[in-house]
């Protein structure tokens, strides 16, 4: 079969699971190229970008900006005209808005939802309405719509976006990170050696709700917590963290998950949380709020504990795992085995290849 030329478009490749998901697909499938903007502000670019061929879209950013977005559209049009892709594969809302708005073309369109913005409290009601209407219209221009988790797909279809036959789910393929001895990892990150550590790792933005972790920690002053990540809330979280919470900013995930004993997520909204899968592959039990596809990663009572966003429930879950080393060990082992089975790189890449072949065989 001839090489399928795929142009992937994403607004920015900031540190996180989405960037790694996209990079792995681009890197593994011949004929793939990545078009992306620049990471701005407090965030930094994911190191995975260095492994793939990148075309920079100078004026493409995450926020809506009519002037810059028009310039970005022109840039994207020029890239498409020069590259002549068989498929334009957009990722996340902003890139999907721009990449799917261009008229005509001989190429097929695919869009991947790595989550959605309907539960993001940083967006106004009007902004969410604009997003919903845009997604409904743009879905009609796609040959295929992909979600990274089944729950996310259900929530999008509930908004009447796309037709049932337009959707497939492709879970991420996640590689186990290099493992380090706990003592060495804690030395690397300047963490205490004699405590059970509860680790939180994410972007420090409102949708990840780091403030909820601080509420939990305040109720458990005898438990040690460590928070890793950067973002616009980093300084305020540092300033308000109680004494039993160490906020270390950006951290190498391989050392972080090797250093802690329990992983926790307090997000208000999620797609498919790759960081939690990495934590499971590191043999950690996971506590996660029941949002997005978290419950597809964490099997409640078997590989960790899934809770509501209630402080009381999160406190109880942390207290239970901190007090029970045998339970932590059993859940961690079960989580590692399940993550290896459910989130293989081979499965993710094969599913994308099949998706590309499928859309090229259709008329739409």
List the model feature ranges, each with a label.
Residues 46, 178-191, 327:
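A short helix/loop element that forms part of the nucleotide-sugar donor recognition site in Leloir-type
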Residues 8-70, 152-155, 160, 167, ...:
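N-terminal strand-loop element at the rim of the active site
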Residues 140-166, 174-176:
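A short, active-site helix/loop in glycosyltransferases that binds the activated sugar's phosphate group
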Residues 268:
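Aromatic "clamp/platform" in nucleotide-sugar-dependent glycosyltransferases that forms part
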Residues 276, 285-288, 298:
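Short hydrophobic beta-strand element within catalytic cores of glycosyltransferases
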Residues 16-24, 196, 200-219, 232-235, ...:
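A conserved mid-protein helix/loop that constitutes part of the nucleotide-sugar donor-binding site
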Residues 237-251:
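Nucleotide-activated donor-binding/catalytic signature segment of Leloir-type glycosyltransferases, i.e.
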Residues 300-301, 305-312, 320-325:
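Conserved acidic donor-binding segment of nucleotide-sugar-dependent glycosyltransferases
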């Amino acid at each position: 079969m001839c090489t399928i030329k795929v142009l992937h478009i994403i607004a920015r490749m900031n540190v996180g699971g989405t960037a790694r998901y996209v990079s792995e697909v681009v890197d593994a499938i011949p004929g793939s190229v990545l078009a992306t903007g620049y990471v701005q502000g407090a965030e930094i670019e994911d190191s995975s970008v260095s492994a793939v061929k990148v075309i920079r879209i100078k004026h493409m950013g995450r926020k809506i900006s009519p002037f810059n977005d028009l310039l970005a559209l022109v840039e994207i049009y020029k890239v498409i005209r020069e590259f002549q892709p068989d498929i334009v594969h957009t990722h996340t809302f902003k890139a999907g808005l721009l990449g799917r708005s261009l008229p005509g073309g001989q190429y097929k369109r695919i869009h991947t939802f790595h989550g959605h913005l309907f539960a993001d409290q940083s967006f106004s009601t009007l902004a969410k309405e604009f997003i919903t209407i845009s997604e409904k219209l743009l879905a009609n221009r796609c040959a295929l719509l992909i979600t990274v988790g089944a729950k996310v797909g259900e929530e999008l279809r509930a908004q009447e976006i796309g037709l049932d036959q337009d959707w497939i789910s492709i879970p991420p393929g996640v590689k186990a990170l290099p493992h380090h001895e706990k003592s060495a990892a804690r030395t690397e990150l300047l963490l205490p050696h004699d405590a059970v550590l509860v680790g939180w790792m994410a972007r420090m933005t409102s949708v990840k709700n780091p403030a909820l972790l601080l509420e939990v920690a305040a109720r458990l002053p005898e438990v040690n917590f460590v928070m890793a990540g950067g973002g616009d809330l980093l300084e305020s979280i540092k300033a308000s963290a109680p004494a039993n919470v160490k906020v270390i900013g950006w951290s190498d995930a391989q050392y972080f998950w090797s250093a802690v004993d329990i992983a926790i997520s307090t997000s208000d909204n999620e797609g498919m949380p790759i960081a939690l899968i990495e934590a499971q592959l590191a043999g950690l039990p996971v506590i996660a709020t029941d949002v997005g596809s978290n419950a597809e990663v964490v099997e409640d009572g078997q590989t960790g504990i899934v809770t509501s966003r209630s402080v009381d429930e999160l406190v109880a879950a942390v207290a239970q795992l901190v007090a029970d080393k045998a339970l932590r060990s059993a859940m961690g082992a079960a989580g590692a085995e399940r993550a290896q089975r459910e989130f293989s790189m081979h499965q993710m890449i094969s599913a994308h290849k099949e998706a590309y072949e499928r859309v090229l065989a259709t008329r739409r």
